[in-house]
Amino acid sequence: MCMPMFGYGVYQTAPEETERCVSEALGIGYRLIDTAQVYGNEAGVGSAVNKSGIDRSDIFIASKIWVSNMNYERATASIDESLNALNVDYIDLMLLHQAMGDYPGAYRAMEDAYKEGKIHAIGVSNFYPERLIDVCALAEVPPAVNQVETHPFHQQHAAPDVMNKLGVAHEAWAPFAEGLNGIFANLILAEIGAKYGKTVGQVILRALLQQDVIVIPKTTHRERMRENIDVFDFTLTDEDMAVFATLDDPAFKPIFDHLDVDTVSGLLNVFVGKQLNGEKLY
């Protein structure tokens, strides 16, 4: 799999805004576009891609199977639905969005879609190390990517060790921590950036890239798109990277804590309960 290290994410981008945003991102030079079934904006992504005039083989589209489709039959159907929504012949990378429900069954559906040429690579998202080991042990086609929350305050120092051993690429969601903890005003990051004439956001993205982490920052503003991708003309020193590492905060509560019972059960009730004759799972 040849996947760009830098991409554009459309999480929480309104469907009516998605085509414009993706078109602008493609025009600026982005070639990896990350969407998901639950985002409700696959159609906008596909429309922008198909109208771009860029050869389809030069654009890398990633989407994700949502928890309500986590068994073989529903996952199989949902892959076809995503292909139709995107209006493309294949999806470059399909991920399981969460390690919930019958994800082994959904994974088998992705493997079959891979063999049929509907998807060109398989991955997972939000799989903690023990779940990643589990799915790799069961997989006929190993996952290429694990997309997990990764940012200065939650740097995932342990997870990459497992990913590296399994040959799974590390992709970050929420590289800017969704703006929490005053991240864009962080004095440590600002001081690093000042040495290179770069912003806090650019320092974050550059640091992650230097750790071989794929990044997919989201913005709906053209100038911020340009700013985000302008990170290939400088390199952080070992000292900079050591300072960046000190920002990792064990006390930081993950944006979405997959080990929190109330969080997980609430998500399943909201997004899956309606799919199961209205009966709540918890």
Name the predicted role of every residue range:
Residues L26, G46-D58, D80-N87, D112-Y114, ...:
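Acidic (Asp/Glu)-rich catalytic clusters
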Residues Q98-Y282:
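Beta/alpha (TIM)-barrel catalytic core signal, keyed to glycine-rich beta->alpha loops juxtaposed to Asp/Glu
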Residues M1-I59, F176, V272, N277-Y282:
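N-terminal binding-site loop/beta-alpha segment at the start of enzyme catalytic domains
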Residues T13-E16, T35-G44, S68-E73, A99-P104, ...:
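Acidic-and-aromatic substrate-binding clefts and catalytic sites of carbohydrate-active enzymes
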Residues Y30, V88-I91, I119, P143:
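A structural motif
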Residues T13-L26, M70-L86, G105, E130-I133, ...:
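Short, acidic/polar
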Residues M1, A75-L95, D112-E116:
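CE4/NodB-like, metal-dependent polysaccharide N-deacetylase domain
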Residues R56-N69, D92-A99, N126-P129:
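A short, structured active-site edge motif that brings together acidic residues
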